[in-house]
Amino acid sequence: MSESKDTTEVNQEVNEKASSQSTKKQINFKRSHFIIILIVTILVTAMIAVFATIGISHWTSGLNSDQRDEMKKVEQVYQTLDDEYYKDTSSEELGTAAIDGMVKKLDDPYSDYMTKKETKSFNEDVSGDFVGIGAEMQKKGNQIQITSPMKQSPAEKAGIQPKDVVTKVNGKSIKGQPLEAIVKKVRGKQGTKVTLTIERGGQAHDITIKRDKIHVKSVEYQKHGDVGVFTINKFQNSTSGELKSAIIKAHKDGIRKIVLDLRNNPGGLLDEAVKMANIFIDKNETVVQLEKGKHKEAIKASNDASKEAKDMDVSILVNKGSASASEVFTGAMKDYNKAKVYGSKTFGKGIVQTTREFEDGSLLKFTNMKWLTPKSHYIHGKGITPDKKIEEPAYQSLNVIPSNKTYQLGDDDKNVKTMKVGLNVLGYHINNHSTEFDSELEDALKSFQKKNNLDVNGTFNKSTNEKFTQQLVEKANKEDTVLNELLKKLN
């Protein structure tokens, strides 16, 4: 038997195929034809994106006369080519090409078809521990885009940023390739390296990343003075339970102000986003709305809000890497004035996909609805604007300098300005931020190289670039000026 899984996509999803007679595995939030299914966490060993998935079951058996006529023609073309083409043909490849053509005709970057082999690879990626680079990716239009790098992951340490566009893997173009195939290229054994060519700000950069074992922690709690900070990395199984337990503990410790840090949280299970909102939002209040055509259904909180959570002043911290289930949760909290939202605008993903699995193990995913906040805000392509904007430091938005580029005295290039800004932030004083590689920059580089046990030559080469990028990332993580600014407001 084939399976069907209805899924909501707040970033990107992977869906499963179905034959006309399929058994459904789903999570019912209420008794109706609206069903929510767990979103698939596509952790590409570079990690793809995690997205909550929702769907409406509107499947009827059989085809109408027009549909039968069209399918008969497709069958005739398939049979003719398979039997009579002058070269040997593959029945499987012809069938796959026909399906790919139908999906491509939708002109929808979030609808896709995966073969059995691709599906197997996808299923292997759905776990909390995996070997990869720790970056979540999605297909946006004809581009492969980074949704967000995971905190402390090899990708983040190498300088990968949200909305970076991946154009090549190991020097080979990935144009036109399905997301799952690209994921396979990025994957590999622990300790091996992969080079991604990314575009950011109109410039292309090669970034080499060492694959490592990635463990996805769901909730981390730290006390900062009188404020409890809960870093929520992903919405996975038991995230809501982990957060509720941590809040109870914080309440016992006397904490009455909390920050829910959703920065670079790409999403995850919609079910967990709803349950997490239910910690703060009372029973029978709408958490998210599902809409398809004229059909609209509200998914509501099923329990009373936590008494400890009710006793707390809540702030939510987001950025452009906050997507999918993060936005479902933030949108609900914002609509009910349960929290003030700080940071920068979120990613913006508000459409829903359904997944279908066929008997041969292949998968089909297609968009079938959208989701809205309790007050009917549609955030797709727009994101959620924070109540109070807190800008990230300029150096955190610097373009990564390609690892295959070398610069020396006398060069004039935009990347030279990046070096000057970055070195200045790292404590190597430079008076100007021009694009000219001058003697002042050369002296600063020599000091940097000497301090970091590199060859002291004043040239910006690959080894210098790697250490330069690593230290900027470490500085951003250590200082966290955005969080510190928020804590000053709250303490």
From Swiss-Prot:
SUPFAM superfamilies: ClpP/crotonase, PDZ domain-like, PGBD-like
Keywords from the named record: Cell membrane, Hydrolase, Membrane, Protease, Serine protease, Transmembrane, Transmembrane helix
Biased composition (Polar residues): 9-22
Active site: 324 (charge relay system), 335 (charge relay system), 349 (charge relay system)
EC annotation from Swiss-Prot or TrEMBL: 3.4.21.-
An annotated GO cellular component: plasma membrane
Location of region: Disordered: 1-22
Domain PDZ residues, every copy: 119-201
Membrane-crossing residue ranges in chain numbering: 34-54
Family per record: Belongs to the peptidase S41A family.
Protein name listed in UniProt: Probable CtpA-like serine protease
